[in-house]
Amino acid sequence: MTTAGSCGRNGGFMVSIKEVAKHAGVAISTVSKVLNGYPNVSEETKKKVQDAIKELNYIPNSIAAALSSKQFGRIALVLDPNRQTQAIDQIFMQYLVGALDKAKELNVEVVTIFPSMIAGMTAEEITRSFLSQSISGVVIYGMSKEDKVLQKLIREKQFACVVVDAPIVNSRTTSISIDQEQAQYDVAKKTVLDDNCKRVLHIAGRRDGYVTDQRLKGMKRLVKDLDLTMMVRQGDFSELTARNVALKYAKNKDVVVCASDLMAIGAMNALIDMDIFRPVCGFDGITLMGYVGKQMNTIRQDFYSISSRAVEEVHQLMNGGEGHQVIMPHSIVKMYYKDIIC
């Protein structure tokens, strides 16, 4: 717990927790409670303390020690296993193993941060928490467009950041992804031309996803280039939702283009249940596609390599590198059972 002995700097002078308390007009114990995330502090009081901390540039002893120690240089991996279902845990594990292997190679320590661990925290609170853990680099996987807190954390440039699948770049932030727009265009074009399709049902991902917008942009370009018609429905990257969309709309379409493999599996099973054939394509290249029975085109992403490169990039930023955009390769494949069995 942060105590009265904590200190910071303001224009070269040490700032004590006592001065923060005085500036905010609260007790020292109240400042300590805010710093340590105690729940029994009103929002009004919390704001007073946070404003005082910011104005005085107060840094607790635990953070100051981390800043000056040789341990300062850990990398936080911000990723959410709960955003996946058990069917595509493969993506989460490939991200994790890719990051851990590269971190071992670079001799840096990584810390896994799940969203539940920082839920409800402000950008300032996350900053203090990360600094207290000697974190100076952050890799964020699949950030939502609605996540204003993490976006603020990136804008403030306190940490070297790499964002996976989000087009955000600044002097201390690198973006890494495949070319989502082109990949969606490529796999949909092949599927459409293979079966001479004209009427497209596109099952898109979550509305708050950066990749959803990029993949939809690819589809709109394809529709224009090939003079197609297209109906777009949200599938939320859910197998069940995509199944229900296909049951309702696929019968009157020539092809079903899905923005993820899991949704493609849901759509294909809906078509099988309706006893009709429509070509379906997915996106990601997960192993589960090989078990469906009906082979579908998909985009293969190398999640291991993407995550490994993300850690390499954040390490470069931590050592003075400049933020930039990294485009990783993709390929169109069909997943066959004989190719995935061990």
Language-model segments: what does each one mean?
Residues K251-C342:
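Flexible loop/turn connectors
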Residues V187-L226, E322-I340:
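An alpha-beta-alpha
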Residues K145-E146, D208, R215, L262-A264:
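Alpha-helix capping/helix-boundary segments
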Residues M1-G73:
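N-terminal helix-turn-helix DNA-binding module of bacterial transcription factors
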Residues I176-H202, E239-L247, A264, Q301-N319:
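Hydrophobic alpha-helical segments within soluble ligand-binding/sensing domains
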Residues A76-V78, L201, V257, C281:
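Short, well-ordered beta-strand segments
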Residues A103-P115, H202, K220-T241:
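Short beta-strand elements in bilobed, periplasmic/extracellular small-molecule ligand-binding domains
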Residues T2-G12, R74-K189, Y249-K251, V255:
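Alpha-helical recognition/docking segments in bacterial nutrient-uptake
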